[in-house]
Design a protein with these regions (language model features):
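Short acidic-glycine-tyrosine-enriched beta hairpin
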Residues: 18-21, 46, 60-79
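Short, charged/polar surface micro-motifs in flexible loops or helix N-caps
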Residues: 30-33, 53, 98-102
């Protein structure tokens, strides 16, 4: 695996391993770290917990996941999110089918988090952050769709601020 990418806003680190047309993403969530609810229009994901425990949101349901629970499939268009629930770091592994540009999405988002452009949940901190978010959402809307703010707000923001 290659080097790690750190997202301080969401308390996450990522490592990527290409797997043909697919991608393996290892994610480490700090205690309280979270990947906010979102969905992928064209990709399926297969999540498993390597170490620790997380609250996993799938559709409208939530459940606690541990290593012994095995792999959880997430079909395209299905809302999902993950929150670390223990008092120690959680390590997850996700197989993304197909990879498309998900690695770029996570790396770009983490870089913006390190620059302080947005707060948890993707809320821009200032006008520079709002412009960044509009361009980011426009660029990656085929990879990831955030469930907040609502899509009509995202579309309006893209229309007003994206270049």
């Amino acid at each position: 695996m290659n080097g790690q990418t750190h997202d301080p806003v969401h308390g996450a680190r990522y490592s990527f391993q290409p797997d043909g047309e697919n991608l393996i993403v290892d994610t480490w969530l700090e205690p309280g770290g979270a990947l906010p609810p979102h969905f992928h229009p064209h990709q399926e994901e297969h999540w498993s917990v390597v170490e620790g425990e997380v609250r996993f949101q799938l559709g409208n349901g939530k459940r606690l996941l541990r290593p012994e629970d095995g792999e959880i499939p997430v079909l395209p268009g299905t809302k999902h999110g993950v929150t670390s629930s223990g008092d120690r770091e959680a390590h997850l592994r996700c197989r993304v089918v197909p990879a498309r540009n998900l690695q770029s999405f996570l790396e770009d988002s983490a870089a913006a988090a390190r620059e302080g452009l947005f707060m948890r949940g993707g809320i821009p901190k200032n006008m520079r952050g709002a412009r960044w978010a509009a361009n980011f959402l426009k660029q990656h809307r085929e990879e990831v769709v955030m469930t907040f703010p609502p899509r009509f707000v995202q579309s309006a923001m893209i229309g007003l601020l994206a270049r």
